[in-house]
């Protein structure tokens, strides 16, 4: 319902924030704290800054953007990082083993934007030639050739799946791939990474400051095609006990530290409201 009603679209005036402004004004009249969380930082900071400026509290996935926010909104508005998390009701481990001895990737591929991210994807895909990779294309419904994946004999492209079904994919495939669009942030990482780990999946990811800080002990971080080929060359023979132990430890770690309950608690502390205990994460 909020699609095209939060970000700025200068060339599409019918896409505007009028409804959002009314909601924030109504909440403020009632003394309800107004909190904005930008999960699209730092790539799309400028598309959301106008909307963010309406709020009493601003959270961002990318800590690097905090000075930019402070420059715009001033000291009266609190700005803090708020990282991605998982919903355990959807993303959680299973005792069943994997069904497919391949890699999977759930997400998009773009020829016209995010060149660095695309290079990392192509490196991972090349490394998977020994085991094959199945892609679930987030942009399968878009007709533009800019969103088409490369034509590789070991890469199979399937239509997009609902977010709630991604968990089963991470459980079903032996390996799940991850790329991070933002690499220089200690708080920004792909949400996909924590969702893979929460499901007990074996994650193979590209590097980033946040990966090094939080996830390097629970995933394989590959930095070049040679490393990727060596890793997948081993994995084609199946998972080792160390692989399984690392995946299990990753699920335990994420579910202990990276759920939406944890993030809501951070928000409530920031606005000085008591946190009601609940079994729902």
Regions found by a protein language model. Give the residues of each.
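Nucleotide-sugar donor phosphate/pyrophosphate-binding loop at the beta->alpha transition
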Residues: 35-49, 85-90
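A charged, aromatic-enriched C-terminal amphipathic alpha-helix characteristic of glycosyltransferases
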Residues: 237-269
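Nucleotide-sugar donor-binding catalytic core of glycosyltransferases
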Residues: 4-7, 11-19, 57, 61-194, ...
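Short beta-strand/loop segments at the ligand-binding rim of alpha/beta enzyme cores
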Residues: 27-36
């Amino acid at each position: 319902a909020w699609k095209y009603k939060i970000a700025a679209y200068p060339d599409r005036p019918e896409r505007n924030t009028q409804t959002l402004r009314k909601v924030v004004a109504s909440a403020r009249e009632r003394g309800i704290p107004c909190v904005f969380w930008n999960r699209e930082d730092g790539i799309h900071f400028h598309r959301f800054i106008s909307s963010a400026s309406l709020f009493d509290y601003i959270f961002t996935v990318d800590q690097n953007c905090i000075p930019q926010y402070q420059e715009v909104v001033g000291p009266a508005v609190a700005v803090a990082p708020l990282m991605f998390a998982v919903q355990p009701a959807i993303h959680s481990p299973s005792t069943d083993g994997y069904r497919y001895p391949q890699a999977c990737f759930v997400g998009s591929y773009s020829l016209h934007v995010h060149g660095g991210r695309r290079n990392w994807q192509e490196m991972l895909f090349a490394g998977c030639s020994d085991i094959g990779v199945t892609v679930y294309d987030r942009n399968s419904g878009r007709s533009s050739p800019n969103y088409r994946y490369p034509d590789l004999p070991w890469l199979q492209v399937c239509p997009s799946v609902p977010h709630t079904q991604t968990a089963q994919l991470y459980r079903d495939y032996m390996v799940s791939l991850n790329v991070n669009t933002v690499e220089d942030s200690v708080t920004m990482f792909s949400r996909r990474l924590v969702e893979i780990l929460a499901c007990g999946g074996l994650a193979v990811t590209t590097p980033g400051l946040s990966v090094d800080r939080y996830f390097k002990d629970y995933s394989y971080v590959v930095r070049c095609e040679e490393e990727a080929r060596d890793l997948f060359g081993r994995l084609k023979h199946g998972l080792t006990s160390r692989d399984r132990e690392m995946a299990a430890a990753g699920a335990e770690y994420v579910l202990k530290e990276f759920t939406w309950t944890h993030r809501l608690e951070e928000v409530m502390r920031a606005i000085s409201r008591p946190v009601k205990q609940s079994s729902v994460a």
